[in-house]
Amino acid sequence: MPASEDRRGKWKRKKRGGLSAARKPKQEEEDMEEEDEENNNNNNEEMDDVENADELQQNGGATPDPGLGIGEVVEDSGSRISDFPAVVKRVVIRPHASVMAVVAAERAGLIGETRGQGSLPALENISFGQLQALSTVPADSLDLERSDGSSSAYVISPPPIMDGEGVVKRFGDLVHVLPMHSDWFAPNTVDRLERQVVPQFFSGKSPNHTPESYMEFRNAIVSKYVENPEKTLTISDCQGLVDGVDIEDFARVFRFLDHWGIINYCATAQSHPGPLRDVSDVREDTNGEVNVPSAALTSIDSLIKFDKPNCRHKGGEVYSSLPSLDGDSPDLDIRIREHLCDSHCNHCSRPLPTVYFQSQKKGDILLCCDCFHHGRFVVGHSCLDFVRVDPMKFYGDQDGDNWTDQETLLLLEAVELYNENWVQIADHVGSKSKAQCILHFLRLPVEDGLLDNVEVSGVTNTENPTNGYDHKGTDSNGDLPGYSEQGSDTEIKLPFVKSPNPVMALVAFLASAVGPRVAASCAHESLSVLSEDDRMKSEGMQGKEASLLDGENQQQDGAHKTSSQNGAEAQTPLPQDKVMAAFRAGLSAAATKAKLFADHEEREIQRLSANIVNHQLKRMELKLKQFAEIETLLMKECEQVEKTRQRFSAERARMLSARFGSPGGISPQTNNLQGMSLSTGGNNINSLMHQQHQQQQASATSQPSIIPGFSNNPQVQAQMHFMARQQQQQQQQQQQQQQAFSFGPRLPLNAIQTNAGSTASPNVMFGNNQLNNPAAAGAASINQPSFSHPMVRSSTGSGSGSGLGLN
């Protein structure tokens, strides 16, 4: 007892420490209160539980977690291990308390303990509505190997079982009846469910496991069953059917086909074992009592094995009326529909009406008109994936081109009754649509074409003794009899001679090939030739009738004879020679008219050509006139440019003379030298400047003797400034007068520069050497113009030999 109490105390301390780290403060208070109650009231029961837990631990068991209210804790991040179904692998940090309780109960059951199993929770798979398998996994579990070496286990949900006659399909030349929920099966394709059963055939990792090999042995199994659908097919019957296939893969595919009813659906003796169970639902306790667990665990077989659908028709009833199942029987599908009450809608499972809609993606998916118009489509389909199918024309007329006599009579009768109401006409016909009725009515021949084949009896051919021509009808080819022999003798070959009506054929051809006026001329001339005899006969008959007006009896007899003769003449056809004469007259008239039109068109062409030439000449004249105007404007521009050039040259010479005379008092001789140097361009300016400098020094020495104190006189300086300004004004007036006159012959540049150099030196009036040097002053007076201003006069003390030249 002391050892058990010590063990119990350790367990209590361990329990308190674990709960304090896992629960919240509120939960800790509740647990402490529960522990106090257990310590006071249930000490003996706790000791028994601890002893039982110790025994389980010694036998390899695990202590159950007493905290049944603790939820499952997993990591937030995980790795995706399957794309379909979407599976994410997460690490479980703490499993759910119910899971631990179930595991503890299973382990307790292994050692013979059954206490506490009645209160175990029932775990249900919410995804598929089945009991979750926890401990038992069969050897052939559906594992899909991943590229990274991992595997993902997933479960295929059972299909909803649909009762009915089944779906009839063609398996080659044989008939294959499938359940309603197995309508996805097709011999030439592989469905998603099949890829989940044997994924190794579609991974591409092994050369022996390919989709083609899977379809080969799958179709071999189905073909083996279809050969004798009344017999239940087993795996032993299919041994040696296909070589090179693993027995496990073969067995798995066989069980899959059997589960879905693709095989053994119409077999008479079906043996479908239920889900395998290792332990019976009824169990016996150690005390000898028998009990039934409330939530017995099931294996994973319950998720892939389900109740087998039952076919209402036996195999003998379906296939007994088909002695030879070959593709040559045209009414094979019709007889199958008669036995199986036609197909059913894949949405509402009702029998299909006469008109239904078929899927283009999968030809076995059918919809009735109500489901299609209300948008109740199969998953993965839309209205664009379905086409309208009419079984009335499925095996016969596809486009409605084949009409029977009865349908044609109904169409004509409906047209008479309902006029242009084609909806009622189509309803009256019954087997054709509105568009087909309209198309067939337009294709019907008119009455004239129908009357061509009618044979009229009692018509005799008469001969005309006057011209010896046999008046017979046309032959089958439309040729005129009697003309072939005559035409062979004639040398003239005329067109359309073999047509039934050569004249009208010629007129029609001319109307389509040439102008309408030419064709009208041809027709008019032909008719005039044909009606010439008629006019002559009518004039003769009018004369005879006038002579018979003498007696009443004779008049009545003549009128009677005239009417009889007119009737006889109206019935007699035209002679062949008259037809050919009209033919030739029409051709000649057409040729003449065409020649006149051709001449007129030629004259019109000549007139238009002359107009074109005249317009081209006028166009050239206008261009030449524009060129003359452009040349005149160009000459004016050239004159303006020449004036501008001369003005720039004068300005340049004046600027150069002003620059060289600016140091003070350059004589006119210096200006003349500068003008000569600029005009010739060959003299040296430096030598001239040196000579001028020497002359200035020589004049400076003789200046006081000539006009003493002149340079210091302010009155003389003022007069010299005024004279310089007046000289500039006169030069500007001369330049304006030269620009006003028209240009004459072009002057050389040296003459322009010489005149400018001799007259454009305003600083010559300020040179003291000219005032003191008579020779220099005389030379300057020769080149400079005279000034006639009244205020300008000679200074006092200056003689006539001063040389200023001022008046």
UniProtKB/Swiss-Prot annotation:
Q: Where in the cell is it found?
A: Nucleus
- Disulfide bridges in this chain: none
The segment annotated Disordered runs over 1-74, 458-487, 549-571, 692-713, 721-740, 781-807
Q: Give residue spans, biased composition: Low complexity.
A: 692-703, 726-739
Tell me, which GO biological process terms does this entry list?
chromatin remodeling
Which phenotype arises from disrupting this gene? Answer: Plants are viable but have alterations in leaf, root and flower development, and are early flowering.
The keyword Chaperone is annotated on this UniProt entry: no
Please list the coiled coil stretches.
598-656
Q: Where is the signal peptide?
A: none
Subunit-level organization: Heterodimer. Interacts with SWI3A, SWI3B and BRM, but not with BSH. Interacts with MORC6 and SUVH9.
What name goes with this protein?
A: SWI/SNF complex subunit SWI3C
Question: Source taxonomy lineage?
Answer: Eukaryota, Viridiplantae, Streptophyta, Embryophyta, Tracheophyta
